[in-house]
Amino acid sequence: MFSKIIQSYAKGNLIVQICIGIALGILIGISSKEISEIANLLGILFTSALKAIAPMLVFILILTSICTKDFSQSGAKIKNIIILYIVGTFFASACAVLANFFFPVKLVLDGVQTATNSSPTHMSDIFKDLLFKIVDNPINALSSGNYLGILTWAIAGGIALKHCSNEAKQVFIDINEGVLKIVKFVVKLAPFGIFGLVANSVAQTGAQGLLSYVKLLILLVATMLFVTFVINALIVFFYTRKNPFPLIFICLRHSAFFAFFTRSSAANIPVNMALCAKLGIDKEFYGISIPLGATINMAGAAVTIAILSLTAANTVGIEISLLQAFLLSIIATFAACGASGVAGGSLLLIPLACSLFNIDYDIAMKVVAIGFIIGVIQDSVETALNSSTDVLFTAICSKNELNYNIK
């Protein structure tokens, strides 16, 4: 009986389960403060599990990605689209930073009063702080959640191991798969954690806490739409000197629509390949560029990482300098490139960006947990942007005469 319940839950739709968790959390939060405090234990356990697995995930994910990927035999077109993917992701990240400056959002969180809200403001202090974090002991970086140190050692390890044997690389691939399975298990428990977090938030802050979540979601979605219709349109126009919107709407209709519901760039690869074939793009090109885009073209993820990191900074009262904003855009770009193929990958990389501002690790993980709450919509829009941009950039880099008459 009990095993059947577990199997039924494991096979259930995560979105539906999260929605049920949110609804029950609101009801409990309104009806009973005592029960909400008990339910909050589930939220604490969930955020603790995320805190435990996130450093190892970032380290293994980035190390394995650098160690195993080989672009040495890529042609000029592939090199061009790699550059375009990274540039597009950077512009999306920079756009998210600007959006947060114009429309800052503050979250209502417990324990913000005790958070570390001091951040270096002078350029020399910023670089000194960054350097000390970068050269941190790797074991200490993993245990303390120093994500800049983790990122540094992961990149260094990936480069150092790039020329090791295929058998050694397979070991890291297997370890990576094992860590991803643990992450998948933790994310599958999200409905319980979200239930506890929402119940406690409603009981402690009332509608004010939920309203801040809605504001954050609106900012995220609006920024992603701006990237879709303005940033991407400008990139296409400057690259082709043609009206970008016919191609953009084809990509939205035939790629973004499906990606919105699958919530997976990898799962949308066959859809994107079929669309590229209809557009008349060379198979030899899109056969490489589309799977590659599903791996490193993460404009939506960059938006999520940048906005949620700055929201965490706003919440604890940290003033962000222009230099820090620029560094955040770079960090969010490369962090987003490592977020592919991971359930909630962009959310789990938020502490990496938060470490730039000396934001308390507990506060960063509370923001991650809120990201899972709004992720019902955020993740769908993020994936739609990521996946449709794969086809968009593939089309303009292909140099083929495109077929716009697609039904």
From Swiss-Prot:
GO MF, any single term: neutral L-amino acid:sodium symporter activity
Domain of life, per lineage: Bacteria
GO cellular component: plasma membrane
Residues that span the membrane, as ranges: 12-32, 42-62, 81-101, 141-161, 179-199, 218-238, 245-267, 288-308, 330-350
Membrane topology label: Multi-pass membrane protein
Reaction(s) catalysed (UniProt annotation): L-serine(in) + Na(+)(in) = L-serine(out) + Na(+)(out); L-threonine(in) + Na(+)(in) = L-threonine(out) + Na(+)(out)
Subcellular location(s) of the protein: Cell inner membrane
Gene3D superfamilies: Sodium:dicarboxylate symporter (1.10.3860.10)
Predominant cellular place of this UniProt entry's protein: membrane
An example Gene Ontology biological process: threonine transport
Pfam family, any one: SDF
UniProt cross-references to InterPro entries, sorted A to Z: Na-dicarboxylate_symporter (IPR001991), Na:dicarbo_symporter_sf (IPR036458), Ser_Thr_transp_SstT (IPR023025)
Keywords: Amino-acid transport, Cell inner membrane, Cell membrane, Membrane, Symport, Transmembrane, Transmembrane helix, Transport
UniProt family annotation: Belongs to the dicarboxylate/amino acid:cation symporter (DAACS) (TC 2.A.23) family.
Role: Involved in the import of serine and threonine into the cell, with the concomitant import of sodium (symport system).
HAMAP family tied to this protein: Ser_Thr_transp_SstT (MF_01582)
Annotated protein name in UniProt: Serine/threonine transporter SstT
Organism whose genome encodes this protein: Campylobacter jejuni subsp. jejuni serotype O:2 (strain ATCC 700819 / NCTC 11168)
Gene: sstT
